[in-house]
Amino acid sequence: MGDMANNSVAYSGVKNSLKEANHDGDFGITLTELRALMELRSTDALRKIQESYGDVYGICTKLKTSPNEGLSGNPADLERREAVFGKNFIPPKKPKTFLQLVWEALQDVTLIILEIAAIVSLGLSFYQPPEGDNALCGEVSVGEEEGEGETGWIEGAAILLSVVCVVLVTAFNDWSKEKQFRGLQSRIEQEQKFTVIRGGQVIQIPVADITVGDIAQVKYGDLLPADGILIQGNDLKIDESSLTGESDHVKKSLDKDPLLLSGTHVMEGSGRMVVTAVGVNSQTGIIFTLLGAGGEEEEKKDEKKKEKKNKKQDGAIENRNKAKAQDGAAMEMQPLKSEEGGDGDEKDKKKANLPKKEKSVLQGKLTKLAVQIGKAGLLMSAITVIILVLYFVIDTFWVQKRPWLAECTPIYIQYFVKFFIIGVTVLVVAVPEGLPLAVTISLAYSVKKMMKDNNLVRHLDACETMGNATAICSDKTGTLTMNRMTVVQAYINEKHYKKVPEPEAIPPNILSYLVTGISVNCAYTSKILPPEKEGGLPRHVGNKTECALLGFLLDLKRDYQDVRNEIPEEALYKVYTFNSVRKSMSTVLKNSDGSFRIFSKGASEIILKKCFKILSANGEAKVFRPRDRDDIVKTVIEPMASEGLRTICLAFRDFPAGEPEPEWDNENDVVTGLTCIAVVGIEDPVRPEVPEAIKKCQRAGITVRMVTGDNINTARAIATKCGILHPGEDFLCLEGKDFNRRIRNEKGEIEQERIDKIWPKLRVLARSSPTDKHTLVKGIIDSTVSEQRQVVAVTGDGTNDGPALKKADVGFAMGIAGTDVAKEASDIILTDDNFTSIVKAVMWGRNVYDSISKFLQFQLTVNVVAVIVAFTGACITQDSPLKAVQMLWVNLIMDTLASLALATEPPTESLLLRKPYGRNKPLISRTMMKNILGHAFYQLVVVFTLLFAGEKFFDIDSGRNAPLHAPPSEHYTIVFNTFVLMQLFNEINARKIHGERNVFEGIFNNAIFCTIVLGTFVVQIIIVQFGGKPFSCSELSIEQWLWSIFLGMGTLLWGQLISTIPTSRLKFLKEAGHGTQKEEIPEEELAEDVEEIDHAERELRRGQILWFRGLNRIQTQIRVVNAFRSSLYEGLEKPESRSSIHNFMTHPEFRIEDSEPHIPLIDDTDAEDDAPTKRNSSPPPSPNKNNNAVDSGIHLTIEMNKSATSSSPGSPLHSLETSL
């Protein structure tokens, strides 16, 4: 039986014999050969390696690298390798050019209508009827000044020019947004690091710097950034479903299947691999390339053609695509992101699986509101056109009895075009295109600022969803506590030491067991390094619990590194790595005499149950009976736990040389009959700022629950220190076992009614598995106990937390302690792992909601007034007092600028003083409705007074009933100017939506707001004074300006009057903007949702989706929505995010398919799914045990089959900061 020690001896010469490739000679293996090798599987690959290279060390020799020392790190050598084998980077799809974005913006239905109308108007304006026919054709140019008749073309030209401005602004918005997304994307990529060995040193380098020949260390939770071949492994199991579609975890070993592929997840174990392919040459890169090449064609083809195309592809690729469809993770792997990722099979995926997540609260409400406004606008514009046409026809041909003359036809058509333009103007005004822009700006602004608050938002909508959070299920370690662990108590040689004992107090043989057991039975990647600054604390690298144990040895004046030098990792005979099911780790050593010794460490109650002996005060082993164990639990473990300490038991077992060798793959038979060495108590202090943060959450109506793997007494003590539990309160603390027993029926099935009896009072879930966390989150979300559906946020750091993170409305992954898999499944990454950052996310989320409401209050006031003025003015005077060009200015510029001004208000602590809005609370409250109607009333009175009596007051000519191409009138200019200034001052009123009186409070904290208000005012002066005919404006005098400003400022005084009226008295006021209820959506619309909302656009075209149902269906306009079409949005897969307003972050690059993983969790079936494990039943023993462990005790098979349809961020701010 060979073991790894033999391997390391046999090849110990390799590292010395290999020199770095600094000369110009070629490598002994080509890129093509490596690619061909990595396409083989298991035994085929093994045979090829043996036939062509001897073994993996032969490949290392040809790649001029050392399996122990790695590459030297010489820059010239690294450059040469990149030149020969490529960079670890997949080039993203080219961004759309500015001209492409302009063309997209031109596709807007309303703009097209306006363009056609303007062109017709322009063409007809050059027609003059024959002399003498003017009188017969009606008043076309009567009363015009000399030469004015020839300027009829200006209005058409001005509309065209306005459309050009709109298109350019829209395209520029798209372009800048895309640029911003790409910047965020590159930031993520730069911050993503992986552990490699260079020059004998273990270092972390950016994923993009990994090159062929690097020796990479892989561990539980990693997402592999490149293809490689295993050099050494401990119980390594990989989830390859992202490439193969096979959900069972694949065991990797030197003698069975040594190939490791990029984009796959390490679900268990650890090891080292030599990198053999990177970037576009890796298996995932090859798929990306194929998808990228076919991406544009596929977009144009329908489903059937796509299916045929897929059938034609060769087996391997078909297999990979299938895998992608099933899992979605392949394309999302964070290290190698590319926009091509999710395009190919997205539609197939979404049809196969309905979305698991509902649309976000805000998106649902906005969608419904948009539909209502769109329908109302369409109706008003249609009625306006019909009334104008009928009035003109009846007046001209019926009342005046004029004949229809052929030469007058162009004149009549000009009238009809004018009426049509007025109708379109009403529609333009009615639909608040600024709304999607406000949503985008608000979320984008928030996301940017949240980075400073240590929240890296991967899915835009998660930011807004956090504002509605009603429950947070938080981990304990590192989130509520500092994750700096130290051993502070110990039970050794039958004595309970309240502080770390002196080494002299411990019998030498017990000390020897302790030192060897801790040194070899902690991951070799866990270590304690000297402090970075003088006088600082030593740096803990790797698993923090293991670092506490290594620190314990240093306190005992022993050096773990000496033991590791003597017993290198390659010499470990067998390792049962830690996972969330085992809650322990065991390492087997083979002694020179042929005997074996196993060291185990883990949760004290678990390891103690396996102990049959204990080391006594004199260092001898004595029998350890159940009652002795109960005594230790009562006198040692419970007192430690009640002080908030985590207890770890250390034990060992000897296998004498004469006895038959055990069946190493049967862990239950191996890790039993142990001898207890010691029990240690590890302290992890509560973060000092956490109790105050939890108090804020509770005040804000958010319930905080702790979900931890620690023992229940430790968990209860920490929960009390944090303020989650208070003395005398009637709340539940349950262990995972007890929780499962209470929520399952006699058949072992989970029942929602049972969960509903528990979760409202549950505050602490201890000794819980990731499955328990997922069950709890799902139970709370699916519950119907409360009126409102709960909105749940969850924190997670482990590989198996993925399902819970995905199921939650918002998943938070730990940026420091979190695994790649957890980060990939999350919506927000906490870059400081701190609970207080979650509270900041709540503040920002609520602020987004408020920002949208502020904008709505402002926008709807503008819309109500403008529509009524345009409609009534058109019907009474046959002309809109507000011209098309003026309305485009009000609509585009003021909407855009107002959305920027109101959407960038910073959050305040007062946001945490009220309860969550809830899923059914309308966007427009009764107070807001009071403000909208109140201000609209004031503005309408002012506008109509000016319209019908203004000429007398100012002693000027009336602008009413002007002929077709009349010059601009002072009268209508005053109406327009006053209208705009009223909006400007009302923007200040709109800053407050909860009835506050001081609308100026904090106004100077928002420089953007002040700049925009002043800037808009300056532009308005220019338009009025110098706009002339194109803007239908006439210069105004100082007096007229002062009156306009006075009437505008009146809105501030009127606002004070409105705020004094109690809303409760106004019973007639209704709320608006409720969320869409499920029963309101017809089935075909649901199907449409799957089509539209689950697609890649979900992520990127969040704004468009907002309006899809309503406005797209009734073919009305939404011009700024197209601004959301940035190329990032195109063809992106949906990030995990909830379906919510726009995933800022979602570049395909940042994305992960959000669909819910199919986990054979025990809540789905009574027994655990062991079919897969039977299929993979352990093979006959092989010489190298180190690579062949199978956890046959418990099979936790997690299929990461992510349905494409759930939301997922592929990743742009799939999204954003720490190493994703």
Swiss-Prot record:
The modification Phosphoserine is found at S8, S17, S338, S1140, S1155, S1178, S1182. Residues 1200-1220 have a biased composition (Polar residues). It catalyses: Ca(2+)(in) + ATP + H2O = Ca(2+)(out) + ADP + phosphate + H(+). Mg(2+) binds at D475, T477, D797. PROSITE patterns: ATPASE_E1_E2. Disruption phenotype: Complete embryonic lethality. Mice with conditional knockout of ATP2B1 in enterocytes, are born at a lower frequency and are smaller at birth and into adulthood than wild-type. At two months of age, mice have a decreased bone mineral density. Mice with conditional knockout of ATP2B1 in vascular smooth muscle cells (VSMCs) are born at the expected Mendelian ratio and grow normaly but have a higher blood pressure than wild-type under resting conditions. Heterozygous ATP2B1 mice are hypertensive and exhibit hypocalcemia and a higher bone mineral density. One of its GO terms (molecular function) is calmodulin binding. It comes from the Eukaryota. Catalyzes the hydrolysis of ATP coupled with the transport of calcium from the cytoplasm to the extracellular space thereby maintaining intracellular calcium homeostasis. Plays a role in blood pressure regulation through regulation of intracellular calcium concentration and nitric oxide production leading to regulation of vascular smooth muscle cells vasoconstriction. Positively regulates bone mineralization through absorption of calcium from the intestine. Monomer. Dimer. Oligomer. Calmodulin binding. Interacts with PDZD11. Interacts with SLC35G1 and STIM1. Interacts with YWHAE; interacts with the monomeric and dimeric forms of the YWHAE but prefer the monomer form; this interaction inhibits calcium-transporting ATPase activity. Interacts with NPTN; this interaction stabilizes ATP2B1 and increases ATPase activity; this interaction controls T cell calcium homeostasis following T cell activation. Interacts with EPB41; regulates small intestinal calcium absorption through regulation of membrane expression of ATP2B1. Belongs to the cation transport ATPase (P-type) (TC 3.A.3) family. Type IIB subfamily. PANTHER family: CATION TRANSPORTING ATPASE (PTHR24093), PLASMA MEMBRANE CALCIUM-TRANSPORTING ATPASE 1 (PTHR24093:SF245). This is Plasma membrane calcium-transporting ATPase 1. The gene is Atp2b1.
